[in-house]
Amino acid sequence: MPEPEYREDSDYVKSVKADAMFDSSRYEVKPINLERIPAMFSQRGLSNETVKDLAPFISLIRDKRNEKFDGYNIGFPYTNGKEETIKGYEIRGHGGYKSKAAGTDSTSSAWAADLSNGNEGLVKSVFFCESAFDAMAFYQMNKTQLGKDVALVSLGGTFSDKQIIGVMNRFPHARAYDCFDNDLAGRIYGLRMMALLEGVPMKINKKGDSLQVEAKGKPFELNTERSLLAQVSKHLSIRYKMGQWLPPKAFKDWNDCLMNKPMEVIHTPHKDERNQNLTERRKSGLKM
């Protein structure tokens, strides 16, 4: 599948490319003390109850080679579903710090919180987010509707076909859900995941605020403000292997939604207002 134009989270990507292989001996790892939950979670709107529910899938990690910082960060372990060996970590720290452990496998591994108590064959829904904090926020906001037959997944600011395939092979009876960000990159991630799960080769390119798509010899344009599933189904026969559970439109991602931090609205003047502004600028120019 051709690589479309989209951004990956540079902080995550830079850290992953620093080392070729993940070396677990480089990191000191310990579980979260539920009697002393790090304040970083509450600063992101995440409740103690949410942290306790997901604590089996979260660690505190310290990089022994980091001479500038000797403390612990929050680590979300990456696995590939084929073996129990940890393949790296998505890392979050104070001051907005985000990275990945050196050598983290972001090609075929991801953070996966399986809430089925290990009964992977019983998982019915897998919710894909761009970060672990987003996945935790999604869980907190929708917990009463989710049940225990679900899994939360973070791709950590990147998107790889092998990540998606590996996760869905791990949960063979589940339906994938696009919970990605409300931006162009998030829409492309969702579209790529749909194409992958439907088995439809797809070319995707940006065209202003829309997406130009070609699949099965058919070119068509998608409005990123509307449901991708509904639009694609008008042009292609799809099996609805993927669902969408996006953040509300006013918010960039699920964590911003939890924290009630809406995106800035760009004010577009009406025609009369634009004409008035133009007249005032011209008058100002004449005075000069």
Model region roles, listed by residue range:
Residues 65-170:
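Phosphate-handling DNA/RNA-contact segment within nucleic-acid enzymes
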Residues 8-105:
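Basic, glycine-enriched DNA-binding surface that flanks or lies within the catalytic cores of DNA
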Residues 26-32, 127, 182, 243:
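Generic alpha-helical structural element
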Residues 144-288:
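TOPRIM fold recognition
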